[in-house]
C-alpha cells in the first residue's frame, strides 16, 4: 500500500476567467499579456505553465498531493479595490474555481469594503473550503474586530479562515529593492502583525469555534513568544484551532515552530507555483501529521479542544 496522499492547503492557480478580467484592466492590478502589474511591487513575468491545470495536477501527483486548496492571490490587492472592481474580479475567481477538476478545492474571497455576508455563507455551503482574508486587513486587534462579521460567518459555517499575505504598501522613498524583498520582508511582517493581532484581541474568546490558518508559518511569529513574554505579554495557551502552514520554510524553521506550537497545528501549505510541497518533515510520524492528518482536521473538524493549562513550551 502506498503512502497516504497529502492535502496542500495553500496553492495558487489562476483560472481563465480571472486572467481575462485582469487583462481587461488598465490600472493595477492588471495583466499585460503575462506580465503582472501591482501597486506595491515591480512588474512580474508570469510563467503560463504555472497556471496550466493539467500540468499542476501532474506536478502535485509527483509530490504525493491528492488535494490542492487554491486561493486568490491576495498580494494583488483585489480585495481592497473599490467595491464594484473588487466584486467583479472576485466573482471571476469564484466562477473559475468552481470549474476546476476534483483534484482542487478553493478558498472563497470577499471584498473588504461592504462584504456580502449572505453570498459568503452561500459560497461556504457550496463547497468552498473556507474564506481567505489578507493579513493587511488583520494587522491589529482593532482590524480583527472590524472583520468580525466575516469571521462569524465562517465560524457558523464550520469553515476555517485563511490569513494570507496581502498587498505591499507603496513606499516611494524605499528605492529599488530585490525581487525577493516583498516575500521575505513585507509578507513576513504582515503575517507577524496578524498573528499578534489575533492574540491581542483574544480571538479565541470572541470566536470559540473558529479555526484559523496563518500562511507562511505566521511569519515565524510564534518563535518570538519569549520576546512577547519578556515585554509584558501574557503567555498564550496552545490553541489547537489555530494552524500555521509550511509555505517557503524548510526543516530549520519548521523545527522551531514545532518546538513552540507542537506538531498538531502545522499543516502542509506550499504556496505553489512559488515553491514545491515539502516531502519528508521531521520523521515519519510528523510527516504524516503535517501532510495528511493536520490539513484534514483544519478543513473538516468543527470542534476545538481548548487545552486548559497548556502553555507554550520554552524553545531550547
Language-model features, listed with the residues they occupy:
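Mid-to-C-terminal alpha-helical segments outside catalytic/metal-binding sites
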Residues: 2-9, 15-67, 95-96, 210, ...
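Acidic-and-aromatic substrate-binding clefts and catalytic sites of carbohydrate-active enzymes
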Residues: 46-51, 78-80, 110-118, 138-145, ...
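Acidic (Asp/Glu)-rich catalytic clusters
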Residues: 57-66, 90-103, 120-127, 150-157, ...
